[in-house]
Amino acid sequence: DLLDEISMGPFGSNIKKECFVETGVPVLNGSNLTGIALNDDEFRYVTEEKADSLGKANAHRSDVVVTHRGTLGQISFIPETSKYERYVISQSQFRFRCNEKVLPEYLTYYFHTRKGQYDLLSNASQVGVPALARATTTFQQLEVEIPDIVEQHKIVEIFENFRKKMEINIKINNNL
């Protein structure tokens, strides 16, 4: 009811070691999903042609990316200010695009709360590699209370201002 589109990452065999090149379309991994917004620092790349062949495994600005296998609970949105217009998600991720009823930033912030993490991880399997069972199906069935869009904008603005202040403080501390 809140999503326009949701899709899994490619099968592992679709991105082999020999597919990586020096520049091109960045491939996301867990280190890129360490906060609310995508961490644009470090990537491996595939060619434009390879990315095109992966179809729905391409994520774009305003999409939200979720880890469904491995380090569970990671969820980040791709901001309009990201370094790249598109990315390829990994085999351990899925991505979704929100419809007009919900801001991707709002939903991402929600899933970073204790309640949101509980909801997200409620169908996790800890046998072997941690994974979300039927990740996209389960995710679509989650019930999330969403305020109206005006209220979402207000909430996101508060959190974004706080997040930006934290980033500045971290940079200051790192330079001491």
Predicted feature descriptions by range:
Residues 29-30, 48-116, 128-129:
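A short beta-sheet element
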Residues 24, 42, 90-92:
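A generic structural signal for short beta-strands and their flanking turns/coil linkers
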Residues 2-17, 31-64:
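Sequence-specific dsDNA recognition surfaces
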Residues 1-11, 145-175:
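Non-catalytic DNA-recognition/assembly elements of restriction-modification systems
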